[in-house]
């Protein structure tokens, strides 16, 4: 199959001592506390920011699992690649990782890394620019079946590329309300009622697209309901009607049928307990988190760039700190 790091994860124990997680996105982030668990924080938003460059890893900082330690699928899109091209493939392509990561110890790298740009992540949202511009019609780099994001190509056309502007009649999924009023920093509360109202009023004239959407309490559930209401992941029927965005990919001529194209699996690490600075080896993983990307990744324009990944916790992808 073509199941990849962003749409499948599994965990298993070997001889009762060591647990592994397989086919995960090579991402890691620092937990706010040792007791922070995915299942207890479903529906809450996290803001992951580039971390680890010559400084202590703070809660909410993200980095990467060392790509040189990853066994690449010899039949997948990442075969034979190295350097930035390998990074881009492991983070952006559908399929390509066969390595199982030992939960008792992974090697990590800082998130601020030459060549790692927002473009690598944002192909999932039908945004193809910079080093990913040539991938827009490559099925291995297809966007998700729902790419509502509240931004559109500047000056018309179907591809955002390097030129984007805020949509005047659509909005992307909102952040937790506490981020807007400044009462939370990196880890949200899961309350997005105000943003939800704006989202439904702007995109749907105040009428939910389905009963499932009306009943959805999380952004990921709403996203899935939108896809289902428009005929599913394999359909090209518009999600939004008569607006600047259809909700379906308009730049790429491909579309992943799998809604999990906007899901990443990230290793949650208790960075404070291990006094990690910069790159580090053999760092224990508390748990692998499934995270739904709610909006395109932000890039501050520096070199190498600082990135912001906004996502909603879906639940656990396995781990829980070791043997079972």
Task: Walk through the language-model features, giving the residues of each.
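N-linked glycosylation sequons
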Residues: 1-324
């Amino acid at each position: 199959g073509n199941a990849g790091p962003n749409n499948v994860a599994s965990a298993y124990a070997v001889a009762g001592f060591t647990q592994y997680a397989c086919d995960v996105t090579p991402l890691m982030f620092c937990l706010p506390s040792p007791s922070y668990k995915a299942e207890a924080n479903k529906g809450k938003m996290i803001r992951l920011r580039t971390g680890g460059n010559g400084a202590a890893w703070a809660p909410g900082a993200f980095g990467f699992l060392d790509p040189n330690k990853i066994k690449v699928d010899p039949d997948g899109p990442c075969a034979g690649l190295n350097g930035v091209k390998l990074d881009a493939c492991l983070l952006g392509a559908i399929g390509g990782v066969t390595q199982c990561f030992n939960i008792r110890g992974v090697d990590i790298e800082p998130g601020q890394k030459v060549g790692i740009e927002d473009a690598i992540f944002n192909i999932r949202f039908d945004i193809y620019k910079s080093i990913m511009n040539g991938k827009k019609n490559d099925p291995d780099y297809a966007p998700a079946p729902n790419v509502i994001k509240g931004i559109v190509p500047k000056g018309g056309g179907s591809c955002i590329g390097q030129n984007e502007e805020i949509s005047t009649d659509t909005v992307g999924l909102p952040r937790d309300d506490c981020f807007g009023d400044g009462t939370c920093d990196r880890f949200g509360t899961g309350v997005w009622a105000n943003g939800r109202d704006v989202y439904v009023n702007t995109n749907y004239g105040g009428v939910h697209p389905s009963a499932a959407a009306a009943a959805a309490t999380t952004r990921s559930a709403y996203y899935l309901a939108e896809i289902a209401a428009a005929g599913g992941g394999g359909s090209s029927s518009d999600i939004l009607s008569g607006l600047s965005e259809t909700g379906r990919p308009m730049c790429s001529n491909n579309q992943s049928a799998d809604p999990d194209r906007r899901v990443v699996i990230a290793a949650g690490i208790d960075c404070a307990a291990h006094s990690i600075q910069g790159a580090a080896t053999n760092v224990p993983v508390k748990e692998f988190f499934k995270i739904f990307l709610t909006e395109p990744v932000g890039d501050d324009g520096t070199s190498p760039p600082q990135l912001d990944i906004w996502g909603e916790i879906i639940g656990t992808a396995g781990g829980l700190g070791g043997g079972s």
